[in-house]
Design a protein with these regions (language model features):
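Bacterial N-terminal signal peptides that target proteins for export
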Residues: 2-13
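Hinge/cleft segment of the Venus flytrap/periplasmic-binding protein
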Residues: 13, 289-336
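C-terminal motif of bacterial Sec signal peptides marking the signal peptidase cleavage site
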Residues: 22-25
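Bacterial signal peptide processing site
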Residues: 27-30
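Extracytoplasmic "Venus flytrap"
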Residues: 41-69, 80-89, 183-187, 237-240, ...
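An alpha-beta-alpha
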Residues: 44, 62, 151-198, 300-316
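Beta-alpha junction/loop-to-helix N-cap segments that form part of ligand/metal-binding clefts
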Residues: 84-141, 232-259
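Hydrophobic alpha-helical segments within soluble ligand-binding/sensing domains
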Residues: 134-173, 275-295
Length: 336
């Protein structure tokens, strides 16, 4: 095993261990915390990188998480909601807006959003979501104990297990394609883990990178006829362009295994799904604890999802002529 392999395994294991330790409650079985009797009125800035189902769900979940802790919009919390439309200059303007307005806390949805606001302020608490690895993104010193003004939830998905799912559905697959945004560090991390897992199974990975949504179809077409299936990570550009991607893949009858459930529902075939709404709820609860003075971001471990349930899009399976094995369907959520 080379140094890079060891480093990747340690990194993935470290993130997943943080999830196991930091999120005993993302599954929803825990007791609800009592809402504070009188929460002081606060202003919260919400910056979302781009509009797509997963990030929208994380946004909605955050508001619910805050509400569960006593913060109700229009009563004791005001949200300044901003969408950067995947534009870096927009992100910088939004970050400066929040700093100038002296918001009490910033909720940053997706890595570029969190990185931009973290560069703009080291004083205002920042809670993130839809971020795969905070340490790799240089947002924290350590995922278990951030040591900065940033904390939140991670959307790290079980990449190696996603490959296992792909091979159960397409058992004869020898070459797997992947499409991701070259500038997204979280996507690159997932692809590195995918390549390590594939090497152990003698699976060849063919990559196609994009820089914006306009590159998606060309990237997909470059893989047609060269791969047996696709794996797409939790990548914001790809997620926002799933309908565009599936125009190509459905025509070629190419199955897509996705990094999260909203992408699978939007035209992918299957996933071991990340639930962004629940992650948003947990982020909201963490934010409320910070605002109430119960915790500080520098001491709050990054939290994430522990259990991943298979989701199968039978509508897509029927369209592309893929038979889903009974062992995969058993216990899975089925979209018809």
């Amino acid at each position: 095993m080379n140094f890079k392999s060891k480093k990747l395994q340690a990194l993935a294991a470290g993130v997943m261990l943080t999830l196991a330790l930091g999120l005993a409650g993302c599954g929803g079985g825990e007791k609800k915390a009592e809402a504070p009797k009188a929460a002081a009125k606060v202003n919260v800035g919400i910056v979302q990188l781009v509009e797509h189902a997963a990030l929208d769900a994380a946004n909605k979940g955050f508001v619910e998480g805050m509400k569960s802790k006593g913060y109700e919009e229009g009563k004791n919390v005001t949200y300044d909601r901003q969408n950067a439309q995947a534009d870096q200059s927009n992100l910088q303007n939004i970050a400066q807006r929040f700093v100038n307005n002296k918001v009490n806390l910033i909720y940053a949805i997706a890595t570029p959003a969190a990185q931009t606001v973290a560069n703009a302020t080291s004083d205002i608490p920042i809670v993130g979501s839809a971020i795969t690895d905070y340490k790799t993104a240089k947002l924290v010193k350590d995922n278990a104990k951030p040591g900065t003004n940033v904390t939140g939830t991670t959307d790290m998905n079980p990449v190696a297990a996603q490959l296992d799912l792909l091979l159960k559905i397409v058992p004869n697959a020898k070459t797997v394609g992947t499409i991701y945004t070259s500038s997204e560090v979280n996507s690159q991390l997932q692809i590195d883990i995918l390549k390590e897992a594939a090497k152990k199974k003698n699976i060849v990975i063919k990559e196609a990178t994009v820089s914006n949504v306009n590159d998606i179809q060309q990237a997909a077409r470059s893989l047609i006829g060269k791969v047996d299936a696709l794996y797409v990570p939790t990548d914001n550009i790809v997620a926002s362009a799933m309908p565009t991607l599936t125009i190509v893949t459905e025509e070629a009858k190419l199955p897509i295994i996705c990094g999260e459930e909203n992408m699978a529902k939007a035209g992918g075939l299957a996933t071991l799904g990340v639930d962004y709404y629940k992650l948003g709820v947990v982020s909201g609860e963490m934010a409320a604890d910070i605002l109430q003075g119960k915790a500080k971001p520098q001491d709050m471990a990054i939290r994430g999802q522990k259990d991943f349930k298979a989701l199968i899009n039978m509508k897509v399976a029927n369209k592309i002529g893929v038979k889903i094995p009974e062992e995969v369907l058993k216990g899975a959520e089925v979209v018809k």
